[in-house]
Regions:
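Repeated scaffold domains used in trafficking and secretory/extracellular systems
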Residues: 63-64, 212-213, 254-259, 296-301, ...
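Residue-level detector of Asp-centered blade-edge/turn motifs that repeat once per structural unit
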Residues: 70-71, 219-220, 262-263, 303-304, ...
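Asp-box/WD-like beta-propeller blade repeats and closely related beta-sheet repeat scaffolds
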Residues: 295-307, 311-364, 375-378
Length: 582
């Protein structure tokens, strides 16, 4: 824990940040609130990540209480003292730049991991094992994973994630040391209660006085927000001119699925380390932030725009927030009737039902939370198996979930709370990235597969497989639009990761395979509001957004970006387009 007096640390950190901001004008967050975890390493004389020695990094920065993460893409805000890594991301520089304030000290700590862990694991899972781009690696999160299976994941990677294999870099002793480390208990209870949540909240003082019309000339409903994972920024993109409107520093390791208010004015961003940020798209400012958990999956916005639901891996909670100022409404512990706690896989808005839906990772239940009912009652639907990675029909009456153990899909009627069908889906279907359209007069859904080289098309009346379309490798994302005859799917994994397939929704035949940037990962398609243009990410640190004509399939423009991942069009998102995820 921090052993220095607060005033001393305040002085040290203030001097450091004053010097840095004096030399680096771009330092700091939007709206005048400066965050110590938003430095841009590209602006510093710092060796490439592969040339760094983690011990030297610790020695160099421990005096200032600052430690770089191993991959160099993020300034990890930690205080390194006496063998303990303590999160101090609560240290904030106030809008006037004159004060430091301890907003919400995090008592959650974990034993400092080995140098091996720091070198290979910390950049995704956090130096303190509390999670980042990857999940927390703690006994409470690993209860369903045997140590032998954990060793296999370390050696072989995991196809449903971006977890790479380390088998060629590690011997058996190294692997076992890492396994024992991640199953070791933290030094203190990992809690994030109402006091911590309330104390973390940050508001822009004049947010209520901001104008209620855009400060730019673009169509506000044809904007995109593009998460640039390479340097933790977000770009606001004009979908008509296909040019950036604004770029700002974000919290660390944002979840790519940005959510919007029903009118499209506000965007809500969730970081993997629990921060929820409210961004005013009209005024291009962060207007509120709160830390709702330690390791967060995602956020959902109610259909009336008044309430947010945050799903956490750590602690095992659902957190309801007031959308206006991100004030805490309620913490819902995730525990079943037998007392078994569970991580939250994801939360979803089900606007036609006036509810949120939560997918649970560790218990065979799906929870529905009524946001338009007093007290936010929770309905717990018991399932036969744990289901993950949800897809919904357009009416949100039917839920389709993946059973990762049985390698199948289940269709659950949310009205009756019963299973009505089982889908023969082998491999690892990525239902959460599925899309729907009308095929020969009836609704069908299509899903990519994270393990097998195919796209599966399913009849949504009898739930039979209509067609399996071969691809050049496992895929992650699918997209389409009401105004296009085509569906697009990537090949995210394997040697053909640079391929992008386009197939005809009427014939279910492959039309074209694009290679946007040979040798580099192409992924995550999104359409403009009218479906005229298609945006494709080159998912690399020196990447780009590639703009295609949706009719001719010809490239028309490239916009350089730093590992662009999730990108969502405001109009398509708030109108629940059948061609995009909700």
């Amino acid at each position: 824990m921090v052993s220095q007096p607060v005033s001393a640390w305040s002085l040290v950190l203030f001097i450091c940040c004053t010097l840095l901001t004096a030399t680096v004008p771009a330092l700091g967050g939007a709206g005048g609130v400066h965050y110590y975890d938003e430095f841009n390493p590209a602006l510093k004389p710092w060796a490439p990540a592969q040339e760094r020695n983690i011990e030297e990094v610790f020695k160099r920065y421990e005096y200032y209480g600052i430690v770089y993460s191993d991959d160099g893409a993020q300034l990890a805000v930690t205080h390194y003292l006496k063998g303990v890594v303590t999160d101090v991301s609560h240290w904030q520089r106030q809008p006037d730049g004159a004060l430091l304030q301890e907003q919400a000290p995090n008592t959650a700590t974990a034993t400092v991991p080995s140098n091996l862990y720091l070198r290979l694991c910390a950049s995704c899972h956090g130096a303190d094992r509390l999670g980042g781009a990857g999940p927390a690696l703690l006994p409470s999160n690993l209860g369903r994973l045997r140590k032998a299976d954990a060793a296999s994941v370390i050696k072989d990677g995991r196809p449903a994630t971006q977890m790479p294999p380390f088998g060629k870099q590690l011997d058996e002793t190294d692997v076992q040391q890492l396994v024992e480390l991640i199953y070791s208990s933290p030094d203190a209870d990992l809690t994030w209660d109402s006091g911590a949540i309330n104390a973390s909240r940050i508001l822009l003082d004049n947010s209520h006085a901001l104008p209620d019309k855009p400060v730019f000339t673009a169509d506000p409903l044809n904007l995109f927000m593009v998460v640039e994972a390479g340097d933790h920024h977000v770009t606001v993109l004009d979908g008509d001119r296909l040019e950036p409107v604004h770029r700002f520093a974000s919290r660390y390791a944002l979840h790519g699925g940005i959510k919007y208010s029903p009118d499209g004015r506000y965007a809500y961003l969730a970081s993997r380390d629990g921060w929820i940020s409210k961004f005013d798209l009209y005024n291009l400012k962060v207007v509120a932030e709160v830390r709702a958990g330690i390791n967060t999956r995602n956020v959902a916005v109610s259909g009336d725009g008044k309430t947010l639901l945050v799903g956490n891996y750590l602690p095992n909670t659902l957190v309801l927030l007031d959308a206006a100022e991100l004030g805490l409404i309620k913490i819902i512990p995730v525990v079943d009737a037998e007392g078994t706690t569970s991580r939250v896989s994801a939360v979803y808005q089900a606007e036609p039902r006036g509810s949120f839906v939560a997918a649970l990772k560790d218990v065979p239940e799906v929870w529905e939370i009524r946001y338009n009912a007093e007290g936010y009652p929770v309905r717990k639907i018991r399932l036969q198996q744990v289901l993950d990675d949800f897809f919904f029909d357009q009416d949100y009456r039917l839920l389709i979930g993946a059973d990762r153990v049985q390698h199948s899909g289940q269709v659950v009627d949310l009205d009756s709370g019963t299973r009505i069908a089982e889908l023969p889906l082998d491999g690892m279907p990525h239902l959460g990235s599925g899309i729907t359209w009308e095929y020969r007069g009836q609704a069908v859904m299509a899903t990519p597969n994270l393990k097998d080289s195919k796209v599966t098309v399913i009849d949504m009346q009898d739930w039979k497989v209509i067609r399996e379309i071969p691809t050049l490798g496992p895929g992650f994302f699918m997209r389409s639009h009401e105004n296009t005859p085509y569906a697009w799917t990537d090949v995210f994994f394997g040697p053909n990761k640079d391929a992008m397939h386009v197939f005809d929704k009427k014939t279910l035949e492959m039309v074209k395979t694009l290679r946007p940037e040979p040798g580099k990962t192409s992924a995550h398609v999104e359409f403009t509001r009218d479906g005229r243009y298609v945006l494709v990410s080159i998912w690399e640190t020196e990447g780009a957004l590639l703009v295609y004509d949706a009719a001719t399939l010809e490239e028309i423009k490239r916009i350089p970006m730093n590992k662009p991942s999730g990108k969502y069009n405001v109009y398509n998102k708030i109108h629940r387009s059948a061609g995009t995820s909700h």
